[in-house]
Regions:
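Juxtamembrane intracellular "pre-TM" segments in multi-pass secondary transporters
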Residues: 2-25, 213-244
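Hydrophobic core of transmembrane alpha-helices in multi-pass small-molecule transporters
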Residues: 36, 104, 115-131, 246-247
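Central cavity-lining transmembrane alpha-helices of secondary-active solute carriers
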Residues: 65-82, 279-292
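Helix-loop junctions at membrane interfaces in 12-TM secondary transporters
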Residues: 109-120, 320-323
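Helix-to-loop junctions at the C-terminal end of transmembrane segments
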Residues: 77-89, 174, 288-301
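Structural signature of the two symmetry-related core transmembrane helices
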Residues: 92-107, 303-318
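Helix-loop boundary and gating motifs at the non-cytosolic
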Residues: 13-73, 237-278
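C-terminal membrane-cytosol helix-exit motif in multi-pass small-molecule transporters
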Residues: 199-218
Length: 323
């Protein structure tokens, strides 16, 4: 394949991508803006939260329990949150989840005790669960089949680009705040003020949600199918869909929340270095998400998923044995 054939194909793919993006509804565009602002805020949060807890004198055991609490609440609340989102609508659900997330960030700064962290972890889990179960139905209701794959991919890609910016900014933020306040860059004051900055940035994500126009709620009369009904009618299909995601999520849950602690304790990396590493990872994930739709159109969705998942395994082994 020569450049004479590659360039026209790239040009045609770019034109097709732009055509699909032009089909996005106003609500979908507002949600993309929300994804960028929220993704940047929580890119900073995910980088610095572990360091904030440890800087207060707590140990990794408490940190692990806090992260487990968030995940457990997300799991338990997922089904009720789905019903709740169906009942009150997508826009109120997104607004409530965003407000709860902001309240959680502020609460972690003003109530930095073990009880406070557990309470805020429960609230964060509820907020993230409600946001997660609302995301998919909202995107489905505000897109047509022609552009839907591109909307999902671009929203995820833009979210990862926002996390790239948040990771990079998060790496610089504690040292910058420490310079302004005359405190230690790895102390609780610098990390606490950084979380306040995250809360302010997350608050700006409320603006695009306010611009979203409410859609008609799809209830049981509109063909709603209970997840229990799906489990009863197609148990084998549901099992095949859930198991790969369950195994992948289990591995990610054991590894990813502690990557920043791993870099700090194993390699003595600074916040800026860790932020840069996280940012590079987010950037490449964003590129992969954005180019996924044309690749899926060309090679098939299932083949693309299998190949990309398989390629990640050797790199996980290399990470564990890196010098």
């Amino acid at each position: 394949m020569t450049s004479r054939t590659i360039l026209p194909r790239l040009h045609n793919s770019a034109r097709e991508y732009a055509r699909k993006v032009a089909l996005f509804s106003p609500n979908a565009r507002y949600y993309l803006v929300f994804m960028v602002l929220n993704g940047a805020a929580f890119g900073i949060y995910r980088l610095l939260f572990n360091f904030y807890v440890l800087s207060l004198g707590y140990d990794e055991a408490l940190l692990g329990r806090l992260l487990t609490t968030v995940s457990l609440v997300q799991l338990v609340a997922a089904l009720p949150a789905g019903y709740f989102s169906d009942r009150i609508g997508r826009k109120p659900s997104l607004m409530l989840a965003a407000l709860a997330s902001v309240a959680t960030l502020v609460g972690m700064v003003v109530w930095p005790t073990a009880l406070g962290f557990y309470t805020m972890s429960v609230l964060m889990g509820l907020a993230q669960s409600l946001s997660a179960v609302t995301y998919g139905p909202f995107m489905m209701e505000n897109s047509e089949e022609e552009e839907r794959t591109y909307l999902f991919a671009l929203s995820s890609g833009m979210g990862m680009i926002a996390q790239f910016m948040g990771n990079w900014l998060g790496g610089q933020l504690p040292a910058t705040i420490a310079g302004w306040l005359g405190v230690s860059a790895t102390g609780s004051t610098a990390y606490g003020v950084a979380l306040v900055v995250v809360a302010v940035l997350a608050s700006t994500a409320l603006a695009p949600i306010l611009l979203i126009r409410r859609q008609h709620k799809h209830g049981p009369q509109d063909g709603y199918l209970s997840p229990f009904a799906v489990a009863r009618s197609q148990p084998r299909t549901l099992f095949r869909l859930i198991m790969p995601m369950w195994v992948t999520s289990l591995g990610a849950g054991l590894l990813m929340p502690f990557m920043n602690i791993f870099y700090r304790h194993t390699y003595g990396s600074s916040d800026a270095t860790i932020g840069a590493l996280f940012a590079v990872g987010s950037l490449f994930m964003a590129i992969g998400l954005i180019v996924a739709p044309p690749l899926a159109d060309r090679y098939g969705k299932m083949a693309l998923v299998i190949v990309t998942q398989a390629l990640s395994i050797p790199f996980l082994f290399l990470l564990g044995f890196a010098p």
